[in-house]
């Protein structure tokens, strides 16, 4: 019966290339007891131009990495253009380590035409033909990975969907969770677990002793919450490949939380511990945060220091050390408090957008990143205020249960 349930959830048997990763083949030879996995969200290419952006940035970078054991793509490989799915999967299959994928809400066939949305919702026909599986599970290095489709379309329209599992999926998940006792179980979906309908019924399936990590994409912002615990990895397309292009011709595409386009690296230990780092695409691995001098609203002559930790958690702790000013004056360390402010990077984009004329926007539409002011989950500010010249740089120390950062960074 359990075998029938498992087969009912897959289109075909998982391809041998991808299954080899579950058995330990491919990728680098594991160093010690650490399994290194890239968690990649939303390349979401819409046409050949955007496919070129992805090839020359995130896919090229992933291809060049030799420190990875495995990669999991968390959905939205394409943006409703299913003709690009075969090329996307070919590129992913060319990476020098096993890769796995979950489908996103844009990785589905769209049936257009008169009344088509009323009679036939999106489905995974092309995904099943090209990828070959939907839900799958495997254990590697004492970590159990469960990859599941949690995008549920209703029959009322092609764009109407919610996050959640069917009852059949829950039965399958229950059977998987009760086999063996790995140190950690990673549930990978497209829509964040915290946004799923019926998540309490899913939590009820998890054995009390099972340690979980929920990872996802979908939102185009980065967020970490230890109360679940949940990791929303952001989007490698950023804000849908929009923005001014860099020297390589790749759009800036800042995410709405203020994090650059990027992905997470997770180092899983055999005892269930894991370490995380955020990797900005096309930037040095050490570049994991930014620092800003933000004028006080009531006194423009004074300012507070603001830190954006691109992959930071809501329980993170930030300290900023300001360099000494003048001979005999020692630098001082300041504890920061988490803020619900809009990221300074987003504020900068909003100011840039406001400076554009209507005619310029019309002729340079793709340079316009449609960002609005909204709280970012990984912004910290000093409780102390400062006056006088802004420091050229600060030293930032960040830590949470799974991430440690020490970085000297220029103040913007």
Where on the chain are the PLM-derived regions?
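Extended low-complexity, serine/threonine- and proline-enriched intrinsically disordered segments
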Residues: 316-356
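N-terminal active-site segment of His-dependent metallophosphoesterases
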Residues: 17-87, 388-393, 412
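Extended active-site neighborhood of metal-dependent phosphoesterases/phosphodiesterases
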Residues: 82-181, 198-215, 219-269, 274-277
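Binuclear metal-dependent phosphoesterase catalytic core
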Residues: 228-324, 379-401, 405-408
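Sec-dependent signal peptide recognition
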Residues: 2-8
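Aromatic sugar-binding surface patches on proteins
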Residues: 344-383
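Short acidic, glycine-rich surface-loop motifs adjacent to enzyme active sites
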Residues: 74, 176-195
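Active-site glycine-centered loops adjacent to acidic/histidine catalytic or metal-binding residues
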Residues: 42, 75-76, 104-105, 190, ...
